[in-house]
């Protein structure tokens, strides 16, 4: 566990999945950094393989950002409605809880995605192909094979030809609205899954100019937030301490730490991915300014 300090993705232990058409390696960045709720991972899917059996979470939104490669998003609401969509670098996918069952299929060059999940309270996942429910470490019906093995026994997943028009839940970053601004050393140029309708998850990319900060020093009372560096360098500022960041660095901050944090961008700029959950009632505290924000647009002294 990182004790609230940055880690590098390559240093996080890899978990291997190989079951029939499923062939992928997962690095659980959130777990390695002590996340309480957020599930964050980098998943490398082998060429021509799937990431998982098709599945739908009962109470957990998921979002994916394609970091490298290309492939297909497989989605189904039932046996009479099965679709695939082409996906590639910088595509953003949002899967609301209890929505279409989905999985990812890599193309001939493989597929690497950054996956973010808000965290489930029930750990219930439905797998329509095997007609099973995953219940945390167990599954139902209890007398059936484990879900990955059960999926493999069904043989290849039938794939329809890709649909040209993609749904509103799949967008390239370049298609999303750019929210940008600069005030002193604070700067942002953000494209965010919230512009696709997400109200429980943040998954946003910022093109940060050299020498800027992503925010004032702050901490949240209820939210977890995290950052992944796609390119460039800088430092993770934690109170008076500074920790280096480079491409592949990951940093997660738990809620209510009492210590302010921010990203300070180096001279080459930074492509920064910001992730987090959206918790009602969260208060953002700015210890240097001695102010807090109990609601959007309202900042008060303390």
Task: State the predicted function of each range.
Residues 42-46, 56-75, 118, 205-209, ...:
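Short, conserved beta-strand element in jelly-roll/cupin
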Residues 97-123, 255-282:
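Ligand-binding loop in jelly-roll beta-barrel domains
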Residues 1-37, 126-202, 283-302:
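A short, N-terminal "cap"/entry segment at the start of jelly-roll beta-barrel domains
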Residues 31, 52-57, 75, 85, ...:
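Short histidine-centered beta-strand/loop micro-motifs
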Residues 22-26, 41-57, 187, 204-220, ...:
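Conserved short histidine dyad/triad with adjacent acidic residue
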């Amino acid at each position: 566990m990182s004790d609230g300090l940055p880690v590098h993705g390559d240093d996080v232990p890899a978990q291997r999945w190989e079951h029939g058409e499923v062939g992928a390696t997962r690095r659980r960045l959130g777990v390695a950094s002590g996340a309480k709720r957020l599930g964050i991972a980098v998943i490398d899917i082998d060429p021509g393989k799937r990431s998982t059996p098709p599945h739908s979470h009962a109470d957990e939104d998921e979002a994916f950002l394609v970091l490298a490669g290309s492939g297909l998003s497989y989605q189904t609401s039932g046996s009479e409605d099965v679709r695939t969509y082409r996906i590639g670098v910088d595509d953003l996918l949002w899967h609301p809880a209890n929505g279409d069952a989905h999985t990812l299929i890599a193309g001939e060059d493989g597929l690497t995605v950054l996956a973010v999940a808000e965290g489930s309270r029930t750990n219930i996942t439905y797998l329509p192909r095997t007609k099973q429910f995953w219940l945390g470490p167990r599954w139902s019906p209890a007398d059936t094979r484990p879900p990955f093995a059960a999926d493999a026994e069904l043989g290849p997943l039938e794939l329809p030809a890709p649909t040209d028009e993609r749904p509103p839940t799949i967008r390239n970053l370049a298609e999303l609205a750019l929210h940008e601004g600069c005030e002193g050393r604070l700067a942002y140029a953000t494209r965010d899954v919230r512009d696709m309708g997400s109200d429980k998850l943040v998954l946003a990319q910022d093109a940060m100019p050299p020498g800027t900060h992503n925010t004032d020093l702050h901490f949240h009372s209820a939210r977890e937030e995290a950052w992944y560096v796609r390119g460039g360098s800088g430092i993770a500022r934690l109170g008076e301490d500074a920790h280096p960041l480079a491409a592949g660095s990951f940093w997660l901050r738990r809620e209510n730490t009492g210590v302010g944090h921010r990203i300070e961008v180096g001279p080459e700029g930074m492509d920064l991915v910001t992730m987090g959950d959206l918790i009602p009632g969260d208060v953002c505290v700015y210890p240097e300014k001695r102010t807090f924000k109990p609601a959007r647009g309202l900042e008060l002294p303390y």
